[in-house]
Amino acid sequence: SFLSSKYSLSGKSFNQIIDSLQREKYINWKKLIEKNDFSNFSKKITEASFKYPYANRKARYALIRGKSKNIKIDSAYFKYRDKLNYNDEELSFFEPYISYLMSYLSIEALEKDETFYSAKNNTNFNIKRIEVIENKIKNTKLKNILARAVAYEEIMNFNNQISHEKFLESYSLIDPNQEYFNEIIGLNKSLMQMRAGRPLP
């Protein structure tokens, strides 16, 4: 696709392309809401439908480079974050919003000189993402949805089974939604039973 071919550009050039595309979408969106009697929620959803996918493009660009690259310390690159809401409960089940927040968590969880592709299957990285949720996300509903998503990624990684208990201990410390927590515990137990030589659940 057009944007996929632009990830090799500098941060400044990539930003300019995304900003230009977003401005075009914003202008069309303004025309749309001026011609229609949209509710405030409809306005929010229609704007979020292009705002957060473009923000996610910027976040993914940074993730590809990881903290081993200058992009992480380039505060100008991350200016787009200033216009985003990280605790919007009304968008808690809106996929583009959650996808962006998951990318944001991953960027924040990376250590110095660590790349996303080397870290993403690591239990310690998922524990750090849980810690970022606890420290950065204030809305309880959003916090639970994001933590559940991270927990699923961890538990479904069979290579990490030996470390799942360590992760679950960290997950339990953020006072998760009990239904979600029980769901994750049950999933982990079932997957553990599927290991070689053990009966299926």
Question: Language model features by range: what are they?
Answer:
Residues 1-201:
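Oxidative protein folding and maturation machinery
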